[in-house]
Amino acid sequence: MSWLKRTTGRMRRGRVVAAGNRGVDDAVTAHLTDFARTRRGVEAYVEPQTSVTQVTLLLVAYDGEWTRRVVPSPQWAHAFAESLQIPGYDAAVVGYPQRMRDYNTRNKKHPDLR
């Protein structure tokens, strides 16, 4: 019960910021841009907000290497992908590419090859 009191108390005092009102940190934008520009075959997957996570943008390169960052909205994520001229997909609709799972499996079996 104390968690509920702490949470509602924060919301009343205005400390909690709605996800849509939050800007994007320059470091996040720089990281995503750098990832997309320094790797081949990058695709963007927009992950919807859930009860435990905010909207995220997942970038996956041709070899399965990936990076994920929190973004303000699905619209922002799609506009970002379009600005970099990379394809953008809704992850809830199309799922994740097999190459990403293969990349994770390779790195678990041989972490020294990263």
Give residue spans per PLM region.
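Intrinsic disorder
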Residues: 1-114
